[in-house]
Amino acid sequence: VSTYIGSEQFPSRLSTPDPIEFHSILRRMDDAGVEVVVMEVTAHALAQCRVAGLAYDVAAFTNFSQDHLDYFGTMERYLEAKLLLARQAKQMVVNVDDEHLALAVQQGRFLCPVKTVGIRARADIYAKNIEVDERGCNFLLCFHKRFRIPVQLRVPGIFNVYNSLVAAALCNAVGVDQDSIRRGLEAVRTIPGRIELLNTGTPYHVILDYAHSPDALENVLRAVRQTARARVI
């Protein structure tokens, strides 16, 4: 977990820091002339009011799955905590291929305008003609059925197609042009600990991934099995 200001990297103890540390980071960013901040807002941070008073131009939900029940107790309480983010956002980007989030959209639980993304479900921004191998994904990025952009993603796994859809929708919401979105997605390289293919010199592939929840592990195994030519151990 790290914080970046330009090319400078700072270690972080939490995905969403406590308020004192967080506002100190924002102050440092402002002093450096930063105009756009991209951050992860955890359910814990929302429940503990770590980001109270902030207003987001746009926010996103990538998925919702079983996690942190030791803290929240039930899936409904966990979802309620995550939905607090919509109260602080001018608009939301939501993956409606996730059945929990699709239901929340149908029930009107987001208190702001919603843009949807997906592969299987009808969505405002979606991917089609998806091809996946062990090195990456090729797909057609479609915006509101008006224009389409071919994307060559250099990280593998169908879940990274979903991540790309969310990133594209966020950028589109704040006025980034389509060519810049494509170039940004295609510039992404392997993230350490996220389906990271290790160079071990062995006749088989070794993959490192941080997957720590049932949903995350399922996604990793599905991604590996899509391209594996032999047994997955």
List where the protein language model places each region.
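Short beta-strand-centered segment that lines the nucleotide-binding/catalytic pocket of NTP-utilizing
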Residues: 1-4, 41-42
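Flexible beta-alpha connector loops of hexameric P-loop NTPases
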Residues: 8-19, 65-73
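Conserved nucleotide-sensing/catalytic segment adjacent to the nucleotide-binding pocket
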Residues: 10-42
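Short amphipathic alpha-helical face segments that pack within enzyme cores
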Residues: 21-24, 163-169, 219
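Acidic, Mg2+-coordinating active-site environments of NTP-dependent enzymes
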Residues: 30-39, 47, 51, 55-205, ...
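Switch II of P-loop NTPase G domains
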Residues: 43-53, 215-224
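Active-site beta-alpha connecting loops in nucleotide-dependent enzymes
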Residues: 190-193, 214-233
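Conserved phosphate/oxyanion-binding catalytic-loop motifs
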Residues: 209
